[in-house]
């Protein structure tokens, strides 16, 4: 079973992905974690990523698609992926469909965690005191939120027509969201 979790930065995708990993015995494919790993390696790709993130931009589809492709074709992750933060653009969504099809896989569930900007800002401010992330600056988050909403409208349109697309109120308390997800899962 492959699942897409998407929503704006700070929506709680990572938290819900961890829940789903336990629930279905899957693997979290966190685009954010993959990008931070590249930054920590101080690779050329990592340097490009940090420049984009510090400018409040999203990393290029080309870089993200390559990182995702490696994971999808790894046999240990086959039909066990929770996509956390991917796809963010229509090009990425179409790329994901193509890659999955070529590896005899599909997306079983798509969950959109819908959260308003004001809630995101409060969450990021709280998260800053709990963990240190270079992209947890209110101004950067505001810019990333606006960019995300502009970029993702086509992705929402692309997926919302699917019978396996579910919108969840991401402003609910963290412990309430798993019950909403469970209501849709046939597990």
Which residues fall in each region the model found?
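Glycine-rich phosphate-binding loop of ATP-dependent small-molecule kinases
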Residues: 1-187
């Amino acid at each position: 079973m492959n699942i897409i979790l998407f929503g704006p930065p700070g929506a709680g995708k990572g938290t819900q992905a961890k829940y789903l990993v336990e629930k279905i015995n899957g693997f979290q494919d966190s685009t954010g974690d993959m990008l931070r790993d590249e930054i920590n390696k101080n690779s050329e790709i990592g340097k490009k990523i940090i420049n984009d993130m510090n400018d409040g931009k999203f990393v290029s589809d080309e870089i993200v698609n390559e990182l995702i492709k490696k994971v999808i074709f790894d046999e240990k992750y086959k039909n066990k992926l929770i996509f956390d933060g991917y796809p963010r653009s229509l090009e990425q969504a179409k790329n994901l469909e193509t890659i999955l099809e070529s590896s005899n896989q599909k997306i079983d569930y798509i969950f959109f965690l819908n959260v308003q900007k004001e809630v995101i800002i409060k969450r990021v401010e709280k998260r800053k005191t709990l963990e240190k992330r270079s992209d947890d600056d209110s101004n950067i988050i505001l810019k990333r939120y606006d960019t995300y909403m502009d970029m993702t409208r086509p992705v929402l349109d692309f997926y919302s027509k699917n019978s396996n697309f579910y919108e969840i109120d991401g402003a609910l308390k963290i412990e309430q969201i798993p019950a909403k997800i469970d209501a849709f899962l046939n597990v």
